[in-house]
Amino acid sequence: MKLIKHVFIIGLSICSIQANAQQIKSTTMTNREIVTKFLNGFNNPEQIQESLALLSDDYSFKNPMVELNSKEEFMVLAKQISAIITEIEIINIAENGNWIAVFYDFGSSVEGLESNVGTEWFRVEGGLIKESNLIYDTVEWRKFYAQMKE
């Protein structure tokens, strides 16, 4: 009888461990899903905090006009750009190990800059975005920011 109890308890434990492992597996996002969720957060102001939570504290961001070296610095920029970015539409996404490359169109509320094509390379480690490099045509954006300073 004791043997049956032990076998029953061991069986329950194994089932419980397997169920827990399945639950953990289903809640873990892939690198591609992490980057997609991050970018989609800019489409909905209510989700932007969830997006920013996907950045590591030492996140580094580069684009042709700025270089930032922390999540805190990027959060200031994100607040500014979320006021003029109207949407991000992912056109294509590719993955190679830790690196995710995304080709997207980002819309803005700035006259003459309503549609902008960019490509951004993200490095993801341990479920967080560690760095990204955004490449886009900045000619008209530089003019826009120069006018704002005047």
Task: Label the predicted regions.
Residues 1-29:
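Bacterial Sec-dependent N-terminal signal peptides
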